[in-house]
Amino acid sequence: MKRTRLLNSELSYEISRIGHTASITLCDAGLPIPSGVKRIDLAIEEGYPTFLRTLDAILSELKVEEIVIASEIHDHNQMLFEQMMKLFEAHRMAPKITEVSHVEFKQRTQASEAIVRTGECTPYANVILKSGVVF
């Protein structure tokens, strides 16, 4: 059995295979997932697993140098944004933050190596995580 925190084999595999600047999208239950992009569906029920708990587990294995978020998060879910930034800080990361419209965000998800769907049901609980390097 794995000794690290992240136990989902599919998600752990995707993290291990992506290179520098490649991306993984973490999303709420409602974000449309484009065909052709690998879907890792963790959603079990409304609110489970949460966006933040899943992000915390991902950050235990993935070095992130940049994040992309929809700018609308500030008007509709500022608390989640602040909690997300605290998680990056807890993992000793200070990624560059790129803000785009929600429409552009959805377009950018097409370039993700994988999209991880959570059971989160709060607005704009979505982030594109761009991989950094550990050296």
Swiss-Prot record:
EC numbers on record: 5.4.99.62
GO biological process: D-ribose catabolic process; fucose metabolic process; fucosylation
Pathway listed: Carbohydrate metabolism; D-ribose degradation; D-ribose 5-phosphate from beta-D-ribopyranose: step 1/2
Localization (cell): Cytoplasm
A GO CC term attached to the entry: cytoplasm
UniProt entry tagged with the keyword Ubl conjugation: no
Any one Pfam family match given in the protein's UniProt record, by short name: RbsD_FucU
Family annotation (Gene3D superfamilies): RbsD-like domain
Keywords, in A-Z order: Carbohydrate metabolism, Cytoplasm, Isomerase
Chain sites annotated for binding substrate: 28, 102, 124-126
Catalytic activity: beta-D-ribopyranose = beta-D-ribofuranose
Keyword Disulfide bond: no
Catalytic residue list: 20 (proton donor)
A GO MF label: fucose binding
Family: Belongs to the RbsD / FucU family. RbsD subfamily.
Function: Catalyzes the interconversion of beta-pyran and beta-furan forms of D-ribose.
HAMAP family named among the record's database cross-references: D_rib_pyranase
Complexes and interactors: Homodecamer.
Name under which the protein is recorded: D-ribose pyranase
Species for this entry: Rhodopirellula baltica (strain DSM 10527 / NCIMB 13988 / SH1)
Protein's gene: rbsD
